Amino acid sequence: MHHLRKAFTLIELLVVIAIIGVLIGLLLSAVQKVRESANRMACTNNLKQIGLALHNYHDVNQKFPPGTVGINNPPFHGNVQFFLPYLEQQTLATHYRWEVDWFHRDNQPVVSRQLKFLQCPSAEPNREQKDLDPMVDGKVGACSDYAGIREVPQELVESGWVSQPATRDSIFMMDSSSRIADITDGTSNTILYAEDAGRPQLWRDGRPVPGELISGGPWATRNLIWGTASDRGTPPWPCAINCSNNREIYSFHPGGANVAMADGSVRFLKVGLDIRILAALVTRAGREVVSESDF
């Protein structure tokens, strides 16, 4: 008597393949979540390092570095050059020439240097930019995923989206410096540095805009952001977080972006944050009332 060996039917085989596919998908999703969690933590540490360096600079100089210098009176320099020594980059700082513009050929070996602590691991690594700013004559600089914030744009006030603050200025300004004593809104309620990742490619809502590049990406240029999305609004208020990286707070982290506060802490600002709250966090002495639970 012959015993027939039971074989898989086609349907059973397809079911097994489908189950394996689902398991692989779940595994890949879990791996991606773990990787992103690690990236976000590394990004947080980068901003903590930047915040500490800025506070050390302040301790020595009794003020923060300017946002940029030389706009109207060259030579032209960005913000990061001022505190490179406090980021354990003394050798790089020593080779930087202050008597010429950052984009001068003599400074190219310095400003084209890729600095890991200025790159969020969730973004594409080792980007550089032939800067589109007409001031810099197309010179190349290594890009940064972080920037200081300059001010609340006047257009937000004029449009009625935010109330007129006592001052629209943030901590970093053109050709001038601020002190901790100037941050009367409170250091825990004022943003010092923030993510603006992915430059020079223009990104909107997690997608690259084909053929569109933006200026301001190199860490050595006037790498300041506004803290609001000027080129994309979401009624009834303009978009605040992760809407565009055109000089606005933008990251590749799901659900929000990291910012370094003036007290040295790092906060994760969530997508959907009220633009009025963000504006209050941008100003250093706007006299707005903000509580920690608001953000």
Regions inferred by a protein language model and the residue ranges of each:
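Surface-exposed loop/linker segments characteristic of extracytoplasmic
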Residues: V22, S37-F295
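N-terminal single-pass transmembrane signal-anchor helix
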Residues: L4-N39, Q49
